[in-house]
Amino acid sequence: MSVRQTLPYCAAASRDIGKPMRPLCRYVVLLATVAAFSTLVHSQKPSKQRAQTHKSAPTTQSQTSSGSLTIKSEPGAIVWVDDVRRGVTDSSGTLTLTKVTGGRHVIRVRATGFKESSTPVLPGRSHLAARLVRTTDEAELKFQQAEEAREKAKDDDARQQAVDLYSQALKLRASFPVAHVGLARALMDLNKNENALSEIEAARKSRPSYPEASAVEGRIFREMAFADEATKSFQRAIREANGFQPEAHVGLARVYEDRGQYEAAAAEYQVAIKQLSDSEPVIYQLLGATYEKLEKYKEAVAAYEKYLQLAPNGSLAPAIRSIIDQVRREASSREIVP
């Protein structure tokens, strides 16, 4: 039974059996959450290190105001804001982002068969026409195929196909840092972590300051149970991005959770949520689970409910509805106990 198939079963069984079923629901939601977050930004193992003082680099992006931005481009084009993926244009080539923080941004747009474009956007702008030019660059086309293959991959055979496509792109263009990072992600998905680290190193040769590469490096180190190295890489990513690197903030949160530093983990999740402008509901599930560990049940329920508000039909929704009921019952029982 797949994770997706198990979620509805988990929700129903939890209502019938009650608290004994709850650990299974937690486990299933965790599996599904990890899978969901792996695709977050295209998206972490325990350490025995002592708790360390939590301090993240301040973000330079304004979080106090936001507006909408409508991008017009090719149908099915992927849109990034400041290197954070925010969505895909519809069949008419339109994507409206309802929450874009104030300040200057860089909008990156990519569509299969076209040359990628990057456009700076000044504060107050509400519309952007991103006109793409068709490309015959074989390296670029292979890279685009690799990205699509990795995102759609459901098993190791498909992931290996993505690896092969990235490798072909790099043979055609040796200096291709974004392809090295994509290949690192694909290798990490295959648990080839040493090879993945080599690709991060290769990416930095032509782009020494590369926030996404540092964030992916942090994830690889966490998979290898090197918590201190993971922390350094995530902090480097945040520093390189002047504070705006949600993947790294989530990665740090996972490391802090591993160490039992739940307050610090919750703070990092909250930063990531603000930077992603509610575009990734799965982080609310992670935040809710952290609040539960802190026995902050009201906050946990609020986080879970926010997930359901943003993704009422999401793959985690059935289990999360069940968990909300369980958390409320647990909170009520604790209030009754003298």
In which residue ranges do the predicted regions lie?
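Canonical tetratricopeptide repeat
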Residues: 182, 216, 250-251, 285-286, ...
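Alpha-helical linker/edge segments of TPR/alpha-solenoid repeat scaffolds
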Residues: 137-138, 228, 258-263, 297, ...
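Structural marker of alpha-solenoid helical repeat scaffolds
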Residues: 172, 205-206, 240-241, 275-276, ...
